[in-house]
């Protein structure tokens, strides 16, 4: 498997999410490089980093969805939980001495791109709207400022 290449159709239009997704792609590519060098310690480090970063990315993404009132946020969170379980199983197998590199890279690349194009695409409008409302609210002085103007002129 060659390095994964970011494609424009993976962009959600939410810069912070796109940057996090690109970072995950970089980590998958680091896994490939470590595996090519047959560096067990480097592979272990990349797997741990991937799991940790993905967990924090999912938590961030889930918070954005919940804050936006995205109606399928609970189902989306379940998808994340199932994925983390699968990746954790690979981590355990690797720690037990099994060579799971190719299998894990295949899962990660297929799952990530499919997830972004299908599952993540579903929340984009709600989150972008929510974020624009926050920016608008802030530019208008926020709730307190508007309330003070309304009550005290």
Curated annotation (Swiss-Prot):
What does the record give as the function of this protein? Oxygen-binding protein. May be involved in a storage mechanism or for delivery to oxygen-requiring enzymes. The oxygen-binding site contains two iron atoms.
UniProt: Fe cation 1 binding residues? 21, 57, 61, 120
Residues where Fe cation 2 binds: 61, 76, 80, 115, 120
- Indicate the secretion signal residues: none
Q: What is the protein named?
A: Bacteriohemerythrin
| InterPro entries on file | Bacteriohemerythrin-like (IPR023504), Haemerythrin_Fe_BS (IPR016131), Hemerythrin (IPR050669), Hemerythrin-like (IPR012312), Hemerythrin-like_sf (IPR035938), Hemerythrin_metal-bd (IPR012827)
Under the subunit heading, UniProt states:
Monomer.
The protein's UniProt keywords, in alphabetical order, are: Iron, Metal-binding, Oxygen transport, Transport
Q: Any keyword Lyase?
A: no
Per its UniProt entry, which superkingdom is the organism in? Bacteria
């Amino acid at each position: 498997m060659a390095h994964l290449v970011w494609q424009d159709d993976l962009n959600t239009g939410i810069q912070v999410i796109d940057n996090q997704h690109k970072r995950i792609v970089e980590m998958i590519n680091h896994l490939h490089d470590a595996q090519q060098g047959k560096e067990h310690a480097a592979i272990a480090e990349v797997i741990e980093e991937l799991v940790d970063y993905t967990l924090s990315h999912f938590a961030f993404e889930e918070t954005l969805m919940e804050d936006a009132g995205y109606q399928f946020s609970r189902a989306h969170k379940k998808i994340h939980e199932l994925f983390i379980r699968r990746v954790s199983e690979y981590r355990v197998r690797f720690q037990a001495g099994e060579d799971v590199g190719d299998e894990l890279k295949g899962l990660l690349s297929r799952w990530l791109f499919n997830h972004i194009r299908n599952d993540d695409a579903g929340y984009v409008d709600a989150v972008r709207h929510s974020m624009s409302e926050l920016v608008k609210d802030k530019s208008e002085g926020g709730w307190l400022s508007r309330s003070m103007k309304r009550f005290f002129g």
